[in-house]
Amino acid sequence: MALLLATVPAFSADSVAPSPLTREPVGGVSLAEWTARWWRWADSQGVAPYLDPDGRLCDLGQDGPVWNLAGTNGRFQPRRECVVPAGKFLLLPVINMIHFQVDTPVSCEELQARAAVNNDYLASAVVLLDGQPLGDMRRHRVKSDGCFRIDADDAHSRLAAADGYWVMLKPLAPGRHTLSVGANYGVPDGGAYSRMQQSFEYVLHVGTRTQVVSRGQGPTQAAAP
């Protein structure tokens, strides 16, 4: 699959069709909180969802009104095929960062600053739904509300801050849909993940299990980010 990289498109206010995106709370939960929950979801699974090579991990840990999609560790370009129950909102990470406290205590403000650094330099971001661009991704930067514990039930778990570009899609009509993502940072001074790229595609079958391409057994071994 070719890497989807392009200049960030200009936002058009003249769209005649209703936007498939929302920034309104879903289930009484803000978009920022949903992104924190996404990181908890990704951290708590036996296999990292962002290492999914082809969609075999789509159902992993899914619960509630929002269905989590996954990006990658920036080292491969998957095409994933999934069945999604009808009526689910879809949370899609475009490109993002998270920083944790590890061994040395770090203030929440410092974690937030570290999570923000690459996201201040978005070089390119394109998201296509069924071949149609979803607008200017610079408008979809989401920061966590302060910092959060990576385990919501453990007050002593790692403190984290997240920052990046996300979209929340309204429930899609039943049937087959494609989501294509291409994004990259361009931090002038370099540094960790400063040239990170995302390039991945989902084929989503909403509300049906027909026509899903058969996949191999078990996840492939891919390097952690």
PLM ranges: what are they?
Residues 122-174, 182-210:
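Extended, well-structured beta-strand/loop surface patches
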